């Protein structure tokens, strides 16, 4: 059962890969025609060579120079034409390969943007990047070359077999002795190599994921002096990746030499037996009418055709090794493409417009794993234009609540409503555009500062961009830069301080001008002067908007209209700062501990 399933999986993967190839039918048809012409022309060479050699008439002392000259000239023409066809085919395959790579990368990347947030929570960024780069390159190398090469091998093998049969049926029997051995050896080795190539791809993805994770946190690594530990962990993963590469490539590489050795034995046997036939024919022991009669030209042609026959079989073994690698990479690529995207908006979904900002959370229960709830029976009413702060220890469910508000995940039980309507009745796009977010982990892309500020509003004018920067108190810093707003940010903005990056994202939020706002620990880990600028910008940004604020620095949320204290997924306390301090509960103790620490 497992074997049948495996075979079906291979066939399905090959057919699916082939569908990408045949999207470019004109290229494929042209490539096939060039391949066919090149191989058929090359097959004429040994036959012409045989005629030229036979025209020498060994043992008679006469040479038919006209026949020799004619066939030599034809050989030059045939081989030159075959080489030209091969050159054109190679150029065409490069172009075809690029088209396939473009299509695959576009499909994978576009699909990634439709996947639910949970996919990115459970997959390393470096591993995903490995799919888009290495795996697609591996598939392309096999798809644009190996499949056509298999067709070329079939033509060469069939043509060579036909010529060999016409020359000496007896030698065909001699040659065929080793063919089953070659086929069985190839089949045995390829069966063992595919799991090794899958492991190789997986280990490379793990290595890339770890490298990406560590490089993005290299400052933290240095602060805590963890360089040696990180290097050791990288060495372990690197060694595992190299071991996986060695095992896969070693077992894949020995297929070709093994098959080549078997084929060389076959050719040696043919040459030996054929030589005996030729000597017996030359001395007259074998009459021309004998099925074993053989002259020198025919023996030469037979050996050449046996080489041509064996060559594709040897190449086929190497191609199979490449296909094992390609199928392993394809499994990973199709794993992305087959991952279900976010659930589609309902057919009756409406666009959220004219947003007031009333939010009602009713009896909401949610867990990333349905058996373990992160938020439990939460009920909260958030009036339009109010500021709701969310505090609590790590793992209390604060960030999860934000994920639910934005519909990165849907609730397991209960409902969340905006302006009196369940958010599942709105289109996701319109719901998310109703919010703007300022996160602790700021994200700046490779582009100018102006482009980063305008990220949430494509049609923003320079005047609007500069006004947003002034509102965020970042305009002065930007103008100190040599290129001002046209300064290019690289490497995710590493040349800009954390506070300045947060101010740029606040400017982005000002420009987006959404009616609802989410601030996720936006003032953590910045100096006091920058924090004052951020707090001033925040107060302006929050005016007139429904705001949800997550912060560990409780001093920053004293002015919130309502503070939700979360512990273990439940709201344990709720009220204004003053009322919560009067209660003397968990919030008060948390606030006092931070205040005492600050003292």
What are these regions (language model features)?
Residues 1-14, 118:
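Short, membrane-interfacial amphipathic segments enriched in basic
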Residues 13, 21, 53, 94, ...:
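Juxtamembrane loop-to-helix connectors within ABC transporter transmembrane domains
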Residues 23, 117-118, 136-143, 147, ...:
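An intracellular "coupling" helix at the cytosolic face of ABC transporter transmembrane type-1 domains
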Residues 28-88, 92, 165-170, 281-296:
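Transmembrane helix-loop-helix hairpins at lipid-water interfaces of multipass membrane proteins
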Residues 40, 78-97, 148-155, 176-200, ...:
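Alpha-helical transmembrane segments of multi-pass membrane proteins
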Residues 58, 64, 163-177, 251-331, ...:
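Helix-loop-helix
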Residues 99-118, 125-133, 198-240, 310-319, ...:
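Short cytosolic helices in intracellular loops of multi-pass membrane proteins
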Residues 345-346, 352-599:
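ABC-type nucleotide-binding domain
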